[in-house]
């Protein structure tokens, strides 16, 4: 196996498959294509932006048999998994248990490790076992339904209800009234509001603070700390309205001081990785720590077993190191030997969405990129900073690019200051148009004077 890695590095001939079709997938394409080790990129299923870096394949991220056929026919060396669903469904195990696939590097944990994201109850119990700071909680299901009602009725307000399983980012409800909380609890467990994901409910103490996202790449023992980010989930300006997949993100996070980040490392990151080792959970991939800062102390809101979207669009913009080399070091268990280089500049991404999102919306609308010469991407990385138009819900139709999702584009900028990066992204978005296009103009508002 060691000889295989030496051969890969020497010949620089990695064929890489990226799973995903969102802005995160496009960002991975952009970053990985810069590596001297990458000679060919494939993306399943991809979008109009990813096709500029490699070959899009019309395959679902959870169609493991079709992914297997592609990996064999294209002689894939490395699979980068974007979304959580294939990880929770066991794509890592699928590869490692197959003699034709087990030589391929897969970025992600085993199905057991992916339960950190796939089950809120599993994650909370894991944190409790390893003394990782998090909100107090209890869990209930159909059998303990009445007990849960009594618990919620007497719970201090606000109270947080979380569907145990994956619910497309919509499985968390913050309730300010007991009647509201009991109604939501009934909807989740008895009326199957979130389907299978809501068979179990985590009832959690509400923590009042400010949120941020912290990312590491781990080999199950060592790790490298990637740039932190803050995302904006609410659809409307002023952080109002329903939650979305993310309307924008910034990095670095001004309130994440060195002192605070040292607490994150000591109290959250290292106990998590130590816990994975102690419980013999296979985990080689990204860990996304959803944190909240309360009185200068970090608490874990959630784990995710992959990179975030739109956070990836700012995190990788600031990562100057070769991502592919880091992924090889991950597979070899040598991340402790790696020192990554982070750009000191600030990054901001703002997401353009379809009218009606996160509810119903139209697809198939033509995108007008205005004066931008290249509609797929802007490659203007220079001494003043850089601009990237990362595609998410887009599709190539002849000579046109059309909308194909709720979140359509993520315009990301790198500049000397956060206000400058935010303004740069807004200036570019002002040149782009499609019917009903909307974006928040207040991304990073807390940090702009």
Label the predicted regions.
Residues 265-287, 304-382:
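Active-site "cap" helix and flanking loop/linker of ATP-utilizing ligase/carboxylase catalytic domains
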Residues 9, 34, 49-51, 129-131, ...:
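Solvent-exposed alpha-helices and their adjacent loops that cap or buttress functional pockets
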Residues 171-312:
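Internal nucleotide-binding/catalytic subdomain
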Residues 17-18, 103, 116-202, 254-270:
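Active-site nucleotide/adenylate-binding loops and adjacent lid/helix of ATP-dependent enzymes
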Residues 403-449:
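Generic C-terminus detector
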Residues 6-109:
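ATP-binding N-terminal substructure of ATP-dependent carboxylate-amine bond-forming enzymes
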Residues 367-404:
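Generic long, charged, amphipathic alpha-helical segments
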């Amino acid at each position: 196996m060691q000889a295989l890695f030496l051969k890969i590095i020497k010949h620089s001939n990695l064929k890489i498959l990226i799973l995903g079709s969102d802005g995160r997938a496009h960002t991975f394409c952009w970053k990985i294509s810069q590596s001297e080790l990458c000679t060919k990129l494939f993306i399943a299923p991809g979008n109009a932006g990813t096709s500029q870096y490699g070959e899009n394949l019309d395959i679902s991220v959870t169609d493991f048999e079709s992914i297997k056929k592609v990996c064999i026919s294209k002689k894939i060396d490395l699979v980068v998994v974007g979304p959580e669903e294939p990880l929770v469904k066991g794509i890592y195990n699928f590869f490692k248990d197959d003699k034709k696939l087990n030589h391929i590097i897969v970025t992600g944990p085993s199905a057991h490790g992916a339960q950190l994201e796939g089950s809120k109850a599993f994650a909370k119990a894991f944190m409790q076992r390893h003394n990782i700071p998090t909100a107090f909680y209890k869990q209930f299901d159909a059998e303990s339904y009445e007990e849960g009602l009594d618990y919620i009725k007497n719970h201090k307000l606000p109270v947080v209800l979380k569907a145990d399983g994956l619910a497309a980012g919509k499985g968390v409800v913050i309730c300010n009234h007991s009647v509201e909380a009991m109604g939501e609890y009934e909807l989740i467990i008895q009326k199957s509001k979130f389907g299978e994901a809501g068979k179990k409910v985590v009832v959690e103490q509400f923590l009042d603070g400010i949120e941020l996202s912290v990312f590491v790449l781990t080999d199950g023992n060592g790790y490298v700390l990637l740039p932190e980010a803050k995302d904006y989930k609410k659809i409307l300006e002023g952080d109002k309205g329903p939650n979305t997949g993310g309307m924008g993100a910034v990095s670095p996070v001004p309130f994440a001081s060195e002192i605070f980040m040292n607490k994150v490392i000591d109290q959250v990151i290292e106990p998590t990785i130590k816990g994975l080792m102690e419980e013999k959970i296979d985990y080689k991939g990204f860990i996304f720590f959803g944190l909240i800062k309360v009185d200068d102390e970090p608490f874990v809101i959630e784990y995710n077993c992959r990179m975030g979207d739109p956070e990836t669009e700012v995190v990788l913009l600031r990562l100057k190191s070769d991502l592919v080399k880091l992924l090889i070091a991950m597979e070899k268990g040598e991340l402790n030997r790696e020192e990554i280089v982070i750009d000191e500049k600030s990054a901001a991404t703002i997401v353009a969405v379809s009218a009606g999102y996160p509810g119903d919306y139209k697809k198939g609308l033509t995108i007008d990129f205005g004066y931008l010469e290249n509609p797929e991407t802007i490659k203007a990385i220079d001494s003043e900073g850089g601009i990237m138009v990362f595609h998410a819900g887009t599709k190539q139709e002849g000579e046109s690019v059309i909308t194909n999702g709720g979140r359509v584009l993520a315009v990301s900028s790198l500049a000397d200051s956060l206000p400058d990066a935010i303004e740069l992204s807004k200036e570019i978005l002002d040149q782009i148009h499609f019917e009903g296009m909307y974006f928040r103009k207040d991304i990073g508002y807390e940090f702009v004077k």
